[in-house]
């Protein structure tokens, strides 16, 4: 069983165990499907993605194989433009091993279906989105 904890506001808090959700993501790992995590606002979609990213690293995936962007973060505001997002992500895609791409709150990206469909065509991309 995989249980994580996260440090928040200088106190150690345990995350709610999401074993079933984690197992579902693991079952679809490296499959050419776009994995979409849905739910009401503040229900833990981003946390599930974080737990899964931690699981990937714990199971041998290197950090440089993981791309995570949260489009609610103003640091990534420019990447809401589809051409800029594609130009940013494409050079980060590994050619000889799988690249795991996580887009959090993808709905903020203009024409996001075009971007995720295009990225999903790449043979070494495993794509996960919330929004």
Question: In which residue ranges do the predicted regions lie?
Answer:
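Phosphate-binding site recognition
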Residues: 1-131
